[in-house]
Amino acid sequence: MIKNSPFIAFIIYCLPILCIAQPKYEYWDADKKQVKSEDNYKRGIAHGKTASYFKDGKIARLGWYKYGKQDSTWKFFYENGNPKAIEHYDFGVKKGHNLYYYNSGKAAQETVFKNDRPDSIWTSYFESGMPRSIESFNYGKRQGVWKYYYENGKPQSDGLFENDKKNGQLVNYYPNGNVQSQENYCNNAPCGKWAEFYDNGKVKIEKEYKDSIEYLINLWNEENKQVIVNGNGNLTLVSDKGKLRGKGTYQNGLRNGVWMFYYEDGALEYTTTYINGKINGPYNAYFQDGTLKSSGKYIESKKDSLWGFYRSNGGIEMQGTFKNNLREGQWTYYFESGKKESEGYFADDKQNGTWKYWYKTGELWKQGVFANDIKNGLWTTFWENGKKLQEGNYVNNKEEGGWQAWWQNNQLKDKGSFKDGIMIGPWQGFYSNSKPNYSGEYKNGKKNGKWQYWFEKTGKPREITNYVVGFKHGEFIQYTENGFVDNKGKYRKGKQTSTWQYYYETGGMQRQQHFKNGHLSGKSILWQLNQKMQCQMNYTVIKDNRKGHEQSVPNGTWIFYDKNGSETNRVSYKRGVRVQ
């Protein structure tokens, strides 16, 4: 909060007049004992010193703004007083050497920025002081040798970047210093020969990348038994917990034949067939209890032909055809009950042609036409009894032209027009007994002009409202069902204005009030059912600075009367406060 100060208050209130003033704001804690932060402004924009403080008064942040942008040196601190970071800015742009520290005060990282982009050598450290990483940048892009270390000082990995892409050899190490893997990259893509090793230094895998395809050449298990020789052999995949996760055959460095994969508990997860490293042929996946989960066929590692997907209870969930991994042709989706949920056609994985949707009970819900995933053409929605609910055309996923809606008894409910998804022109509504409900016009999706509403049973007027582009504006009147006026008045841009009158159901006056911009203002009168005066009131409108809006409050003399209309009491107010 801002501490109460005559000097500060003077600056704040004079700011609109003294445009060249440069006020200083101090924000204090709840007890007003300690400054939490301070900021300087020029012409309403942060300019000059800025600072924040811990509860004990020690500084947490110290910096400078220049016309709303960070500038010069910024310093950040831990609660113990040790530095946390030192950063440099030039009119909002980070630059130069920047330093970061651990809570202990030891260096954590040194960075360099050039025009707000990483540049030159970045170095980070463990809290012990040992190097953690050495990274090289050139104007925001990784460039040159990158090295990472374990806290014991031994290397973790090192590699080369060229123009932000991995190029050349990347080596990873175990904490004991032995090589974990040797990788080669060409423009960020794996290429050439790769090797993996066990932590005892013995070779685990030798493989090679050709045209982005991985070829497994040799593989040794933990007992140092070679199971893949020159790209051929049977391989068993085991989890870190020693559980069987998969098994199959390699030929000429690529997976071939039937492969089987398992859940951690040993249950079969899925089976598939490989030809020269690509999935070709039948594919079947299972839930852990052995229930079929999905079934289909692959060609060149892409889903193809008819596929079925099933629920854990054995019921079908969806079924359709793939072509080159994309949905093609007719697809059908099902509820858990097994009844159809929706059905239609895909072309290149996009909905096309007529689609139908059903209620869970089995009755048709809606149907319409898609063109490349976009609604186009006639769409019809139905009640569960089969009668039409609504109908109209879409163009590019938006309602267009005349639309109609019906009640379940087939009586017209609504009718009107759309343009580009927006309601336009005359609209009419009807009750299920075919009597009129409403009538009016839309302009660019907003009510405009005179709108009329009627009661359902009697057909008598219920309300007459005038609109200007969505706002109630002009004469307004509401009626009771027996034909008497209930209330009437005027609106201006959606807010009550001028004199409003309210009536008893018998037709007698109940109250008369005056409004200004939606708020009670001026004289209001209340009448009793016998039409004797009950109360005379006066209001004025004030601005509530705390809430940032206007409100009506009692003002002037209020006069009260008994059931016979004789005065019983008077009370005076001044801007919401009762005056003795």
Identify the residue ranges that each predicted region occupies.
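Glycine/tyrosine- and acidic-biased, solvent-exposed loop/turn segments at the edges of beta-strands
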Residues: C19-Q580
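Bacterial Sec-dependent N-terminal signal peptides
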Residues: M1-K24
